[in-house]
Design a protein with these regions (language model features):
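Ferredoxin-type iron-sulfur electron-transfer modules in oxidoreductases and energy-metabolism complexes
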Residues: 15-34, 55-87, 105-132, 259-260
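Local cysteine-cluster metal-coordination motifs and their immediate loop/turn environment
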Residues: 36-55, 81-103
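A conserved FAD-binding loop/helix module that cradles the flavin
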Residues: 413-440
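FAD-site-proximal beta/loop scaffold in flavoenzymes
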Residues: 245-271, 355-419
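N-terminal Rossmann-like FAD-binding beta1-loop-alpha1 element of flavoenzymes
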Residues: 139-162, 283-291
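Feature captures the FAD/FMN-dependent oxidoreductase FAD-binding
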Residues: 134, 139-141, 191-241, 334-346, ...
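Rossmann-like dinucleotide-binding cores of NAD(P)H-dependent redox enzymes
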Residues: 162-165, 169-199, 205-206, 287-334
Length: 440
């Protein structure tokens, strides 16, 4: 049956089971045993592999010394969003990949789970671990309340600045709130972590406020001593094939947002046969979640090979373990429609010739009720007065300064680094230090 899209494909119990945590937290005993596996290396490679430079051997030693709150403070010193980072960071390609335990055992210390144990311990039992410095009389505007913006705001508030965050959404948190797979972050953790950051004080925020529409860059420069741009990527790349305006095709990021904000997962429309086009984490998260929502056949189609997929091998294997089929070396050439609704996609096999990706001319079709685009997001620069762009994003120097005096930028809107929560946190932290150096 074509166009088989409906709600309530599963029972309430099945939804609860499917969206339970993928990596349950460690208890005290488990954390001690896992932490005891650490060699506490000198010049530890795991620290070098962490984008925020957390002293991993130190916080693990603090855990094994029965001081999880002290371990959390060590983590928060470098990454104030360490709780969410512990849940969503691709540790298998960062700190855990660098762990020397891999050499002999191929089983690294579970750094991510240990980090979560520590940060959860402090957030569940203690007051905010930092005190705000005396107000220094200076004001900073932050555009975007995602990881980069929250990190920058917290660091500046600690130094006595009055910070105002402007965000276009109805909640702060950015992708942590709207874009993370629901089974990776349960119990409104993103919202709780945001409240934890704000509890330091000195941070105001205005929601449903969009730069270029509700306020201008010039206005911010006039009203504040410094401006930090930490907007996310709000545009989505097109497939560049005919038929994208038909029913049944959607952006993966938009649907994931619906999942994250849904009060009842059963109210989400789910196709029986689903195609996700892309090879990154968004594609994986989309495919796994639509499968967990009751779709029978879910296929990820990527234009290059497995090694070229930006999603980690662990995440690819997780998708396959959840029943998702991944097809490589294929690109969409036509959406097949029936009565203004998508009923399939025609693909062409691809190969690399003279260093370029080309179609082979051989084609095949996959039936589908729903198709999701997950081929990358773009920075929408429709606001007047924005700094110079490079490669479609804001250009910054090594101190996160833009081409406009008094304006800094960091996170996904900037043309450097990886689009990771932990990388955005580091950008916000470094930009805050740069702003402080400039204004103090």
């Amino acid at each position: 049956m074509l166009n088989d899209i409906k709600k309530q494909r599963l029972s309430e119990k099945e939804y609860d089971e499917n969206f339970d945590e993928i990596h349950p937290p460690l208890n005290e005993h488990e954390a001690y045993l896992e932490g005891d596996r650490c060699y506490y290396c000198y010049d530890a490679p795991c620290i070098e592999a962490c984008p925020t430079g957390i002293n991993i051997p130190l916080f693990i030693r603090q855990i094994t010394s029965k001081n999880p709150e002290g371990a959390a403070k060590t983590i928060f010193d470098e990454n104030i969003l360490g709780g969410m980072s512990a849940r969503v960071c691709p540790t298998e390609t960062l700190c855990e990949e660098a762990c020397v335990r891999n050499t002999g055992e191929d089983r690294p210390v579970k750094i991510g789970l240990l980090q979560r144990y520590a940060t959860d311990s402090l957030m569940n039992s203690s007051d905010h671990p930092y005190k705000r410095s005396e107000d220094n009389g200076k004001k900073v505007a932050i555009v975007g309340g995602g990881p980069a913006g929250l990190s920058c705001a917290h660091r500046l508030s600690m130094k006595g600045y009055s910070v105002t965050i402007f965000d276009s959404k109805s909640k702060l948190g950015g992708l942590n709130e709207y874009g993370i797979a629901a089974y990776k972050s349960l119990d409104n953790f993103a919202e709780r972590e945001t409240k934890f950051v704000l509890s330091l004080g000195g941070i105001d925020y205005k929601l449903n406020t969009t730069i270029g529409k509700d306020l201008t860059v010039d206005q911010l420069k006039k009203d504040f001593d410094a401006v930090f741009l930490g907007m996310g990527l709000t545009g989505v790349n097109s497939l560049l094939v005919d038929g994208e305006d038909n029913n049944g095709i959607d952006d993966a990021v938009r649907y994931i947002e619906d999942i994250r904000q849904a009060k009842d997962l059963g109210e989400l429309p789910v196709g029986r046969k689903v195609i996700v086009i892309g090879g990154g984490m968004t594609a994986i998260d989309m495919a796994v979640q639509i499968k967990k929502l009751g779709s029978e056949d879910v296929t990820i189609v990527y234009r290059r090979g497995q090694k070229e997929m930006s999603a980690s091998l662990v995440e690819q294997q997780n998708a396959q373990n959840n029943g998702v089929l991944i097809k490589h070396w294929s690109k969409p050439v036509r959406l097949i429609t029936n009565d203004n609704s998508v009923c399939g996609v025609e693909f062409e096999y691809t190969s690399v010739k003279d260093g370029k990706l080309v179609g082979t001319g051989e084609k095949y079709k996959i039936d589908s009720d729903m198709v999701f685009r997950a081929i990358g997001q773009t920075f929408e620069d429709d606001a007047d007065g924005l700094p110079t762009l490079g490669s479609g994003r804001i250009s910054v120097d090594e101190n996160y300064k833009t081409s406009i005096s008094g304006i800094w930028a960091g996170g996904d809107c900037v043309n450097e680094g990886e689009d990771l929560t932990v990388s955005a946190v580091e950008a916000g932290k470094k930009a805050a230090e740069s702003i402080h150096m400039e204004l103090s």
